[in-house]
Amino acid sequence: LGDVYKRQAPFESVLTHGFVLDENGRKMSKSLGNVTSPQDVLKEYGADILRLWVIGSDYYDDLRIGKEILVRHADHYRRLRNTLKYLLGALSDFDKKETIDYSDMPEIERWVLNKVYELSKKIIQFTQNYQLGDIYREVYDFCNDDLSSFYFDIRKDTLYCSSYDSIERRSC
C-alpha cells in the first residue's frame, strides 16, 4: 500500500527469461510426455535443486529442464554441500582469539584466501550485472576444483595429524 501511495514500484528492476523447454529444446507438451512439473521436481529432488536449476540457467535464452539437467544439478548440490560440511567441520572448534596473521600463514593458506578474495570480487560484479548463472558456476568451480580437489586434499593430513596449536593447523 505504501508503494501505491508513493506512486513508485516496490522494486528497482525486473528480471525475465524466455520460455521453459524440455532438455532437447522442445516446447513441453502433455501429448509428447516431456513435461517437467515443479511439484515433481520438488518431490524427487527438493527445493534446493530447483533453485540451483533456476540460478544456473541462462535467462537471456529459453530455459531447458529435464531429467539429465536435474541430475547434474543434484550432483553439483551434493558436491557443494559436502564442501561446506567439510569447512564447517574444520571450523567447528575455531576460536577467533587464535587467529593467525596473514603474513604468518603458510603459502597455501594465503593462496586460498586470495582465491576467496578474487571470487568475492567476481560475485559482486556478477550480482551488479545480474549474471546469476556466472555466480553459480564460479562458486561451484571454486568449491569443486580449488577447495575439494586441491586445497582439502593437501590439508587433510594437517587437520588430522598436526597438533591443535600448530600454525599449520590453526591456519587451515
Model regions: which residues?
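Long, charged, mostly alpha-helical binding arms that flank functional sites
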Residues: 7-172
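Short, small-residue-biased leader/transition segments that mark boundaries at the very start
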Residues: 1-5
